[in-house]
């Protein structure tokens, strides 16, 4: 199954606000109380929220769940930490891109340096003390500057620092899962995959 490239607003109406997918918000969420929702459907919707927000394929999400299961600690929290520390998500949280798909495009088009080295993989896992900045070209600088102008006034994540002289971001620590701006029950996602295998 490939990455979703269809109408984004349909997904937002179905699953609720997904800030990583688009910066629009749904007008009115349909009343789903009359419909009977099975446990499977609830788990599936939570999994789909996570998948569409971060722009992952099904296979990528399965791999992240496997890695999270092997790690110490709560599988759900480790899963969210792994997803939040992806390079495309860090660029989105820093405000260098308006959405996660826009951040993926920045990375794929080779506009981003991590610790002074060119990185062209959106799934690159950032670590604490990583420095993320646009490439030293005018085109890269303009793209990031335009996104940062739209970002002004929004709250920056506690695990990140943004410096404006040369535009660069610093990852201070691993993200705290309480800060994530997505209403999701990560345990239902883990349950969904534990029942699949």
From Swiss-Prot:
- Annotated Pfam families: Ribosomal_S4, S4
**Sorted UniProt keywords:** Plastid, Ribonucleoprotein, Ribosomal protein, RNA-binding, rRNA-binding
Q: Which SUPFAM superfamilies match?
A: Alpha-L RNA-binding motif
One GO BP annotation is:
ribosomal small subunit biogenesis
Q: Does the keyword field hold Coiled coil? A: no
Q: Can you name a GO cellular component term?
A: small ribosomal subunit
The record's HAMAP family line, in alphabetical order, gives: Ribosomal_uS4_B
The protein here is known as Small ribosomal subunit protein uS4c
Organism annotation: Cuscuta gronovii (Common dodder)
Q: What is the lineage of its organism?
A: Eukaryota, Viridiplantae, Streptophyta, Embryophyta, Tracheophyta
